[in-house]
Each structure stands twice: as structure tokens, then as C-alpha cells.
Amino acid sequence: MALNLEKKQEIIKAFATKENDTGSCEVQVALLNERIKLLTEHLKANPKDHSSRLGLLKLVAQRRNLLKYIKRTNHARYVVLIEKLGIKDR
């Protein structure tokens, strides 16, 4: 259920703004987005797993806050990021 190392490195490489960039907002949002996708699939198969549902809600809130920060500071980066991730603009 968790992201493996290869998948994480692939996401970091795709969304990094410079070399060795693992903590920028874009990378964090991309990693959260992948974890949210995995948890969503898990919850479809296990609808009574309420602790995972709470974890999913926390991840979604964290992603929302990071996206809000990116939108506030650099709108152009925000637009590119949501297009790459396939997230709807709110």
C-alpha cells in the first residue's frame, strides 16, 4: 500500500524544480497525490477501514493546504502543477 522507493524517486524526478530537490511544494503535492490514489483504491476494496479513511482525509487536507500556498505565492506554478497531476481547480 505504501509507495516503494522506485516510485517515489520517479515522482521526485518528474516534479523536482532543480537537482536533488526532494522537499519543494510541487514534489510534496505529487507524493501526497500518489498516496491519496493508493489509499482511495484500498478504501474501495475495504470500505469499513475507518482508520485509513481518517488518514486519507488528513492527506487530502495537507495537499489542499500546500496547493493553496502554491496558488497564493506563484499562480503560474500552480496551474502547471494541477494540469500535470490532473487535479481540478477549486
UniProtKB/Swiss-Prot annotation:
Any one cellular-component term (Gene Ontology): cytosolic small ribosomal subunit
SUPFAM superfamilies in the record: S15/NS1 RNA-binding domain
Record-linked CDD domains: Ribosomal_S15p_S13e (cd00353)
Gene3D superfamilies given in the database record: 6.10.250.3130, S15/NS1, RNA-binding (1.10.287.10)
Effect of E19Q: In strain: ATCC 43504
InterPro entries hit by this protein: Ribosomal_uS15 (IPR000589), Ribosomal_uS15_bac-type (IPR005290), uS15_NS1_RNA-bd_sf (IPR009068)
Keywords, alphabetical: Ribonucleoprotein, Ribosomal protein, RNA-binding, rRNA-binding
Similarity comment: Belongs to the universal ribosomal protein uS15 family.
Signal peptide: none
Lineage: Bacteria, Pseudomonadati, Campylobacterota, Epsilonproteobacteria, Campylobacterales
Originating organism: Helicobacter pylori (strain ATCC 700392 / 26695)
UniProt-recorded name of the protein: Small ribosomal subunit protein uS15
Superkingdom of the organism of origin: Bacteria
Subunit structure: Part of the 30S ribosomal subunit. Forms a bridge to the 50S subunit in the 70S ribosome, contacting the 23S rRNA.
